[in-house]
Amino acid sequence: MEEKKKTPEREEEQALPVQELPTDIPAEVRQKLAEDLNEQATEDLKQDVREAEKEEANDEEVKANPEMLTKSRLLKLLVKKQYVKLREVTEEEQPADLAELLEELDENNRLVVFRLLKKDVATQAFAYMSDEARDDLVNAFSDVELVSAIEDMSLDDAADLLEDMPAGVVKRVLEKSSRQTRESLNKLLNYPESSAGSLMTPEYVRLRQGMTVSDAFAAIRRQGENAETVYTCYVVERNRLQGVVSARSLLLSDPSTPIVDIMDDNVVTVKVTDDQEYVAREMQRYDFTAMPVLDNEGMFVGIITIDDAIDVLTDESTEDMQKMAAILPDDDATTYFGTSVWTHAKQRIPWLLILMLSATFTGMVTTHYEEAFVSLPLLVSFMPMLMDTAGNCGNQISTLMVRGLALGEVEPSDFLKVLGKELRVSAIVGAVLGLVNGLRIYLMYTYLYAGQYDNVIGYAVVVSVSLFFSVILAKLVGGMLPLAAKKLGADPAIMATPFITTIVDACSLILYFQIAQAVFRGMM
């Protein structure tokens, strides 16, 4: 059997002796690690290594990158107790990549590796991990570890983490945290959920009006390590925001230039009570990487950075998509595979039950026109096409309206504008679909089913005219319902696909049979 080629780095790992646990790890954590890395655990790790190697054997990315840090390589370092080497290789990884790798490990191995990481590396990786993986770690942490993690995290991330913890745990952690951290976190935790205040961080670079560019650079060096961003600095006097200065402006200015000469005093701000989605849209609108936040008295209290804004937009988009697909949104849901089968079912069943019961109206319409089926059974074959086409047309415009309302491109006050535009659009779409469908029916039943059906032209006219008016109806219903929902304070996404399909189906059938009765009056 051909022996696997070893890279110089892998050979070095094989040659390294067993190493003691790093001395900078707190004694309590060292004790836990010693228990987790006993002989039995090492045997279990060896089995995990073998399974990981099987998984990676057919991974093209691993084959193309022999130096890549993989799950099996990480576990091998644990088995061989090469803790210093483990720290070195993890330190070279991007925090996001390391977080992804840690999530591939089972809960016990993830905890062991995380405890072995250097403090700054662990903190950075922790910020990129999924909520589920972070919760697993937090539940296993001692109070000492949890306080240490909170102290090292940015304040907004720490506040987000504490929000999901039991009140008793939060109280213990805050009591053991430094006074400055405790006061800052208490302020953030007191802001309403989903508000700008709950999203912001008070960690920013603060400048004064009397500074020069040279003084500003000195201030950045002092404050920058703990600041959320150094790309934008804030000129503040008596807790009131006077202006902003970009790093670009500072770099391109003479060191002796006064800050007031280069700062922008026309600053766009938001209030702590503003909705987080509104803040994210404003940042998107102005192309900001950070947004200043003021309290109700106009005092400058913090900033919201672009990474948090992106998270908000992603969450809101996901929630809208779930509602439009008749799925109940779940704040605790993670990824598709990270969500349990029961949770998936629980999210989908309620709306599906409502829609199934609402289909009773469609059934009642069909039953009412039962005599038409007996007289002209061919009418039944066109019903699926008619309802599907009308439903698709309604879904098209409702999706555009929900998006437009979310982005602020459309307002409920634009009701008449939307109505006029959709009347014209639907007339064109309905005419094209009606003509093509009429031609299809005529050719199909004249030649393919020649002699089997009478009055083919009559059927073509009934279906095409019904389709024309159904498309117009669907476009109007799909466009108007989200606007009406927004006006009434309801969520427009709820009025999208689920309700529109049901309404349009029933109305399309009524139109269809009424037109059929008019054309085939003597036959029904």
Label each region the model flagged.
Residues 338-347, 411-426, 457, 461, ...:
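Membrane-interface segments at loop-to-transmembrane junctions
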Residues 381, 395-406, 482-486, 497-498, ...:
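Re-entrant/interfacial helical elements at transmembrane boundaries that shape
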Residues 2-331:
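Hydrophobic packing positions in regular secondary-structure scaffolds
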Residues 368-382, 449-462:
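Membrane-water interface of transmembrane alpha-helices in multipass transporters/channels
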Residues 320-321, 387-403, 502-509:
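Short helical (or helix-break) motifs at transmembrane helix termini and adjacent helical loops
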Residues 356-373, 435-451:
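Juxtamembrane "helix exit" motif at the C-terminal ends of alpha-helical transmembrane segments
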Residues 308-344, 395-420:
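Non-transmembrane, extramembrane segments of multi-pass ion/lipid transporters
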Residues 95, 351-359, 382, 386, ...:
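Alpha-helical transmembrane segments in multi-pass membrane proteins
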